[in-house]
Amino acid sequence: LGSKVAVVEFENDVHKSLEYALRLIGKMDDLNTPRRPVVIKVGVFDPKAENHTTVSVVDAIIKSFSKAPRIFLAESDNYRGKALDRLQLWKELFSDRVEPFSLSDDTETRKFKFADEELELSHILFKPNALVSTHILRGYERGSILKNLFGLVPDIRKARFHKRLDTLLADIYEAIGGIDLAVLDGTYFYDGFGAMPHIGEDGAKYRVKMNTLLIGRDAVAVETVGAILAGMKPEKMPVLKEFVKRGLGEGDLKNIEVVGASFESLRKRFASAAKTQRNTRAKGDAPQTWGGQANQVMKSLVIDGFFKLPNKRTVDGVTKAFEARGISTEDKEDNIAGILARRVKKGVLRSAKGPNGWVYWTD
């Protein structure tokens, strides 16, 4: 077996459990060295939500790189806020050695062509720096560890890449020389609507505490094992399929050595957690269908001022905004047009027919 993924459960001492997981997957001497700064790419879409790696897990990762001369907690700007503002979630971990880093503000960059477009990536992402990708364990078709690379794109207009996301992420992975360590934070398990990036403050309502960590040097293998625990089918996840097709990691569980806790026992625990979440959603107000989720996203777009003048939005523009908030829009433009028409009828939006079709706005 070529790839190894450690799966460990923990109680209070996250660092001790993470250290144990690292011992299970093998030596870290090539990463934890005075010669290599470390970049920890955290994934924080919305600072108001809690669907990001916990402070405790990031702290444990930092402590595991005891020899690293510098450690950067890295993120880029998005429409929810500046990177440095969103990184304040982990401010208690900042020190002379550990610092927040905005990938959007770096002036020392390298140019690469991605998905038919030239982008500039921060210099800290390239070797010899060691790159750690950490995100939450969730039932989300686009994944977590590999999807986290989307945050390496420095500008806020990331939505333009959503329909080519799998290609873009694999291109970025190859350009920077890959992920050196993947840490999937299963302190909580997010599923259904709770797994969506745009969930906001309601995210904490739709999660189950699991206190589980998945760690490995093969990021594709870690994503695969996490997806299976989350009840997903890796072979049907576009991002994973693209990485496997390029030979960037192992996506077949039969070829992955899962060490640590009993994987079959954990699968049963996570299946039970998913059932608990379904019951919670059934009793609560979380939308469970595409239409329900789409209406929730439309409501958030209106509240966030997406339609506020001078902006006048087309159906195509709204479709891209849906994609940016994690809603699949394939073959859904007519549905989105219908949602917009209903908002106009209710007086929430105004509309007019322009030279390029209908546009929508609020005063």
Map each language-model feature to its residues:
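N-terminal and secondary-structure boundary signal
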Residues: 1-282
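Short, cationic-aromatic polyanion-contact patches
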Residues: 269-270, 354-363
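Positively charged, polyanion-binding regions of nucleic-acid-associated proteins
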Residues: 290-312, 341-344
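Short acidic, hydrophobic short linear motifs in intrinsically disordered regions
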Residues: 309-324
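Short amphipathic alpha-helical interaction segments
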Residues: 329-344
